From Swiss-Prot:
Record localization: Cytoplasm
Gene transcribed to yield this protein: gap
CDD domains referenced in this protein's UniProt entry, alphabetically: GAPDH_II_C (cd18127), GAPDH_II_N (cd02278)
Pathway membership: Carbohydrate degradation; glycolysis; pyruvate from D-glyceraldehyde 3-phosphate: step 1/5
Gene3D superfamilies per UniProt: Dihydrodipicolinate Reductase, domain 2, NAD(P)-binding Rossmann-like Domain
Alphabetic keyword roster: Cytoplasm, Glycolysis, NAD, NADP, Oxidoreductase
UniProt-listed Enzyme Commission number(s): 1.2.1.59
UniProt entry tagged with the keyword NADP: yes
Broad enzyme group: oxidoreductase
Active site feature: C142 (nucleophile)
Protein name (Swiss-Prot/TrEMBL): Glyceraldehyde-3-phosphate dehydrogenase
Quaternary assembly: Homotetramer.
Annotated residues for binding of D-glyceraldehyde 3-phosphate: S141, C142, N143, H196, A197
């Protein structure tokens, strides 16, 4: 099996997780990561033996002063890789694109970028095979990834005609000390539908979907209430069986575990998972309600880690990997430890 050489531009919440995930793949090699600031994350990368590059030679001076070895600049990294994963702050990826194209590398962008940055938006369970061979892909946002995992799973089994969803979004990631809110529930945005419906349609353009969102003062996870209209009547048992057997979806029983909140999910993950990451979509089992063709449920999205598996699959897709959908799911999920329970 040929090995794809990958560079990660950005070592923040998503970038660091994607970089570490790459090191666990048999068909990929992490050539290096790009860091702008010689902070604790850079020290961690250095301690793990991850080659560090800087945007330009100017930033390298500060790294060297702190004893952090620098392997070169972003341009030099691009000359050594087949694929670059752009995990820079929102909007920066579009600014970086000309540099990537000049270097002739395939690109994987994040959901904070506008869809136009890439040839297609990407979600593994929805369009992995169709995305193979693209020059660039945009992995949709954490919320959209959660919605698409659910929608494409149920659509494959029953057909989905329409979706209505209310998203309760975390206000900030744990390390984002300058974001909020800290004592408010904020319409995010105040207009309807929210951008999440538009984002879903970049992958499923045929879908009738409307979304609304608010931001709340928590850092743990997002929570969605989703109502789906299916193509045919179903029984609750059928829906639960489908979700229980689907990849990257975890059913959590509040009755069996006592878990009724995002904070309890994270607390449980702290007992058994590195960084308390939950890359699976969590569906609360008792919340699943079925009435003919209508399915309602609550689901939770760990915004720091849910897109990591999709990034790995997107790398394979742009690199024209010979792995099928089932094979990439097995390789990615097995290496990252995705499973059906928190423990």
């Amino acid at each position: 099996m040929s090995v794809v050489k990958v560079g990660v531009n950005g070592f923040g919440t998503i970038g660091r997780r994607v970089a570490l995930a790459i090191t666990l793949q048999k068909d990929m090699k992490l050539v290096g990561v790009v860091k702008r600031t010689p902070d604790y994350a850079a020290l961690y990368a250095a301690s793990r033996g991850i080659p560090i590059y800087t945007p330009t030679a100017k930033e390298a001076e500060e790294f060297e002063k702190r004893g952090i070895k620098v392997g070169g600049t972003l341009r030099e990294l691009l000359a050594r890789v087949d694929v670059v994963v752009d995990a820079t702050p929102e909007g920066q990826g579009a600014k970086n694109k000309p540099l990537y194209r000049e270097a002739g590398v395939k690109q994987v962008y994040q959901g904070g970028e506008k869809p136009e940055v890439a040839e297609a938006s990407f979600s593994t369970l929805c369009n992995y095979e169709e995305s193979k061979g693209r020059g660039s892909l945009r992995v949709v946002s954490c919320n959209t990834t959660g919605l698409l995992r659910l929608i494409c799973t149920l659509n494959r089994e029953f057909g989905v005609e329409s979706v209505r969803a209310v998203l309760v979004r975390r206000g900030a990631d744990p390390k984002e000390v300058k974001k909020g809110p800290i004592d408010s529930i904020v319409l995010n945005p105040p207009t309807l539908p929210s951008h999440h419906a538009v984002d879903v349609r970049t992958v499923l353009p045929w879908l009738d979907i409307k979304t609304a969102a608010v931001a709340v003062p928590t850092t743990f996870m997002h929570m969605h209430h989703v109502t789906l209209k299916l193509a045919k009547p179903v029984e609750k048992r059928e829906v639960l069986e489908t979700l229980a057997s689907a990849p990257r979806i975890m059913l959590v029983s509040s009755g069996d575990t006592g878990i009724k909140s995002t904070s309890q999910l994270v607390d449980a993950a702290r007992l058994s998972r590195m960084g308390y990451d939950i890359p699976e979509l969590v569906v609360f089992e008792e919340s699943v309600a079925v009435d003919g063709r209508e399915v309602m449920l609550f689901q939770a999205v760990h915004q720091e880690s849910i897109v990591v598996p999709e990034n790995i699959d997107a790398i394979r897709a742009v690199a024209s990997s010979p792995l099928t959908l089932d094979e990439t799911l097995k390789a990615t999920d097995g290496s990252l430890g995705l499973r059906k329970t928190l423990w």
